[in-house]
Amino acid sequence: LLVLTFLNEHRAGPSKRIVDLGCGYGPIGLMIAKVSPHHQITMVDVNHRALHLAEKNKKQNQLDNVIIEESDGLSQVENEHFDFVLTNPPIRAGKNVVHRIFEEAYQKLKTQGELYVVIQKKQGMPSAKKKMEEIFNNVETVNKSKGYYILKSQKG
């Protein structure tokens, strides 16, 4: 749902810098990289196994517009700012971790940059939406399906 929503809005147009935060084995970032090869994708995760699988999937798909980095949130991604941050946040890590991810996204976004979040209503969507509003001063539900919500905030 996150990939479809994002690509519907940003498939074409000029090249953008996108970070897939908490990429896991890579389904979000790699799909966007494959469908929109003009975008530059940085994929980050703290889990070594996930990064290994993401790297393997990147090679199998022959994607040269993807960089994969180890980082706890965006704390180790230095000297880079992004047009978009996309995340399926690690809900089981707890509310504090999820909220820190939103704060780091705000810091790493360019002005007018956007944070896209996919989250289930029953796994903290109302709390996430409230925190995004608090940080960005805006949040909107841009899509929803089967209990999943796509929330978007823009940095002013």
Per-region residue spans from a language model:
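Conserved SAM/SAH cofactor-binding pocket of Class I
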Residues: 1-87
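Class I S-adenosylmethionine-dependent transferase superfamily signal
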Residues: 32, 104-105, 132
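Short beta->alpha hinge that forms the Motif I/post-I loop of the SAM-binding pocket
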Residues: 45-48, 97, 120
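Glycine-rich phosphate-binding "P-loop"
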Residues: 87-96
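A short glycine-rich, Lys/Arg-flanked "PGG" loop and its adjoining helix->strand segment in the class I
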Residues: 99-111
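Conserved beta-strand signature within the Rossmann-like core of class I S-adenosyl-L-methionine
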Residues: 112-119
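Conserved class I S-adenosyl-L-methionine
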Residues: 120-135
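Core SAM-dependent methyltransferase catalytic element
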Residues: 144-156
